[in-house]
């Protein structure tokens, strides 16, 4: 059962509890917003990280986008950018490299 199905069935999942706690909102209110499509809690099944909710009644999220280009390929610089984003409190990070060994760069950034 996915999160939307759980919400529509009135099931408060661990993700809903965690986001409600982080956001300082009532879990039942968040459940209702998810069930009606007013909030989402995105999740990458391949990465274990904290949950972040997006939508009505939740705080604005900060996303950091980093990545190499075909002109500048410096994996260490991307790692430094990722660390700076984390230190600055970014909620999410998008690694958008288009130049160099993409798998190696992403692996390095995620390590």
Predicted regions, residues:
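An N-cap/entry alpha-helix motif that binds or orients negatively charged groups
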Residues: 3-52
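Short, ordered loop/turn segments at secondary-structure junctions
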Residues: 45-46, 67, 97-101
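Catalytic domains of carbohydrate-active enzymes, especially glycoside hydrolases
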Residues: 30-38, 79-96
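N-terminal active-site wall of soluble small-molecule enzyme domains
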Residues: 49-50, 73-81, 100-109
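Alpha-helix-loop-beta-strand connector modules within alpha/beta enzyme cores
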Residues: 34-43, 50-64, 103-111
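Active-site mouth loops of central-metabolism enzymes
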Residues: 8, 16-20, 58-79, 96
């Amino acid at each position: 059962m996915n999160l939307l199905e759980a919400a529509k069935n009135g099931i408060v999942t661990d993700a809903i509890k965690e986001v409600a706690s982080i956001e300082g909102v009532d879990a039942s209110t968040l459940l209702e917003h998810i069930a009606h499509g007013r909030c989402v809690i995105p999740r990458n099944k391949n990465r274990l990280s904290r949950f972040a909710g997006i939508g009505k009644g939740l705080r604005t999220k900060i996303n950091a986008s980093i990545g190499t280009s075909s002109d500048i390929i410096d994996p260490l610089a991307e790692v430094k950018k990722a660390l700076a984003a984390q230190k600055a409190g970014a909620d999410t990070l998008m690694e958008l490299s288009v130049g160099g060994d993409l798998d190696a760069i992403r692996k390095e950034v995620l390590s």
